[in-house]
Swiss-Prot record:
Subunit (UniProt): Monomer.
PANTHER family: FRATAXIN (PTHR16821), FRATAXIN, MITOCHONDRIAL (PTHR16821:SF2)
One record GO biological process: iron-sulfur cluster assembly
Designated gene of the protein: YFH1
Family as reported in the entry's similarity comment: Belongs to the frataxin family.
Record's protein name: Frataxin
InterPro entries for this protein: Frataxin/CyaY, Frataxin/CyaY_sf, Frataxin_CS
Organism: Trachipleistophora hominis
PROSITE patterns (UniProt xref): FRATAXIN_1 (PS01344), FRATAXIN_2 (PS50810)
SUPFAM superfamilies in the cross-refs: Frataxin/Nqo15-like
Annotated GO CC locations: mitochondrion
Locations listed in the record: Cytoplasm
Function summary: Promotes the assembly and repair of iron-sulfur clusters by delivering Fe(2+) to proteins involved in these pathways.
Length: 107
């Protein structure tokens, strides 16, 4: 039981740090960002809305992308990696931002 509490605390800290870092990364000229109740909504005109949310019961972050669809990121050594391909969440968003740039013509 104590291990589960420690794991949950570690997850909550890592999730908070990751959401804070994502909020900074997404604060750019492409869209508008809202961060409320541990959910980030990032809306890009002409592309759609991203949603990033904590899922404490399974210790994951879930992402909904208007470009690539849904993804689940599990915690590995205090970082979140995509469950299907192992990509770290910050790298995932770097790639998404590149796709947005191409879609919007580098505006």
């Amino acid at each position: 039981m104590l291990q589960k509490i420690a794991d949950q605390r570690s997850y909550l800290t890592a999730a908070h740090n990751t959401l804070t870092a994502l909020e900074k990364k997404l604060d750019n000229d492409y869209g508008e960002i809202e961060h409320n109740n541990n959910v980030i909504e990032y809306t890009v005109d002409g592309v759609g809305r991203y949603v990033v949310s904590r899922q404490p019961s399974v210790m994951e972050l879930w992402v909904s992308s208007p470009i690539t669809g849904p993804s689940k990121f599990g915690m590995v050594e205090k970082k979140f990696v995509e469950k299907k391909n192992g990509m770290e969440i910050m790298k995932y968003f770097e790639m998404e931002m590149e796709r947005i740039k191409r879609m919007l013509g580098n505006r």
